[in-house]
Regions:
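Short, charged, amphipathic alpha-helical segments
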Residues: 9, 39-51, 73-81, 113-116
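Alpha-helical transition-metal enzyme core signature, strongest for iron centers
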Residues: 18, 22, 49-53, 57, ...
Length: 127
């Protein structure tokens, strides 16, 4: 049980780190665009954010094995969807698509994005 709890902790740390990095890159990109009027830096930061989502899928691959089957499938599916969307956004070169990767259509300011919600849900279920 202690080993499983340590695995959960490791997984949650990687997910929290990825969510924090994605959020930081998004805030920095927004600042580059609106405060600095630097569209090149904005694009570069959004590309880094997309790459962060792609990397998160591979960084968690082995750690997901510690989860019970239902949580493992659900989490793997969500991370794959984030990564696939990020790959598509990068392939298209669409900054708009990159900016929308983690948000529901009806997202409201101040609400957690889909990655943050996934982390919060896992934290609750793994207690």
């Amino acid at each position: 049980m202690a080993e499983t709890q340590a695995d959960y902790t490791s997984l949650l740390e990687v997910l929290r780190d990825g969510a924090a990095r994605a959020g930081m890159l998004e805030r920095d990109a927004r600042s580059a665009l609106y405060a600095d009027k630097d569209t090149g830096r904005h694009r570069a930061l959004m590309e880094q954010r997309a790459q962060t989502l792609i990397d998160l899928e591979s960084r968690t691959a082995d750690l997901l094995n510690a989860l019970p089957e239902a949580e493992r499938r659900q989490t793997r599916s969500a991370l794959r969807a984030f990564a696939d969307g990020a790959r598509t956004a990068l392939d298209l070169g669409s900054v708009f698509y990159m900016s929308a990767l983690l948000y529901r259509d009806n997202h409201k300011a101040g609400e957690p994005d889909k990655l943050q919600a996934l982390v919060e849900d896992l934290e609750t279920r793994l207690r």
